[in-house]
């Protein structure tokens, strides 16, 4: 996993347009950019600097609302809270890696998408289902858009 984030930082340091972040994440994790975008819509309403405070005392950071639970691991890999808040591309890549981890548990399924937000506890199955339904609605709308409109939205999201 350590090498993964070294590669991510290297990829982000090359002169790549921000709009390519979604496509980079898609290629790195084999997760559709539209699905990642649908999650970002739900998580932060496309606000890269969003901060969410949870009842359990944890905090969600950035465009993909990365939970502070992950910070110990991310800091070891050179990723800070500040980067998650200020660099939407890093947020997208980290979010995709977390979703990929959930897919290793649940397979490529809506249960995995729900676990992105609600975690893996058996007690949170209903929450996972409700969350996944919201993402499905966002995703369905994106899939119905023209390629031009979709590209415009993806570009705006990381340039805010």
Curated annotation (Swiss-Prot):
Residues 1-19 form the signal peptide. It holds the Pfam family SLT. Gene3D superfamilies: 1.10.530.10. The keyword Endoplasmic reticulum does not apply. Keywords: Signal, Virulence. InterPro entries: Lysozyme-like_dom_sf, Transglycosylase_SLT_dom_1. Belongs to the IagB/IpgF/P19 family. This is Invasion protein IagB. It comes from Salmonella typhi. The lineage of its organism: Bacteria, Pseudomonadati, Pseudomonadota, Gammaproteobacteria, Enterobacterales. The gene is iagB.
């Amino acid at each position: 996993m350590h090498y993964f984030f070294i590669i991510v930082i290297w990829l982000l340091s090359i002169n790549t347009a921000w709009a390519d972040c979604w496509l980079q994440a898609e290629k790195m994790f084999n997760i559709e950019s539209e699905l990642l975008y649908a999650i970002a819509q739900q998580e932060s309403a496309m606000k890269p600097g969003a901060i969410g405070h949870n009842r359990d005392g944890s905090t969600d950071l950035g465009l993909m609302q990365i939970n502070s639970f992950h910070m110990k691991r991310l800091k070891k890999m050179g990723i800070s809270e500040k980067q998650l808040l200020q660099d939407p591309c890093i947020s997208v890549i980290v979010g995709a890696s977390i979703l990929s981890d959930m897919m290793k548990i649940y397979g490529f399924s809506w249960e995995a998408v729900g676990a992105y937000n609600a975690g893996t506890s058996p007690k949170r199955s209903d929450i996972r289902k409700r969350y996944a339904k919201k993402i499905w609605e966002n995703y369905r709308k994106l899939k119905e858009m023209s390629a031009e409109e979709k590209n415009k939205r993806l570009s705006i999201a990381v340039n805010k």
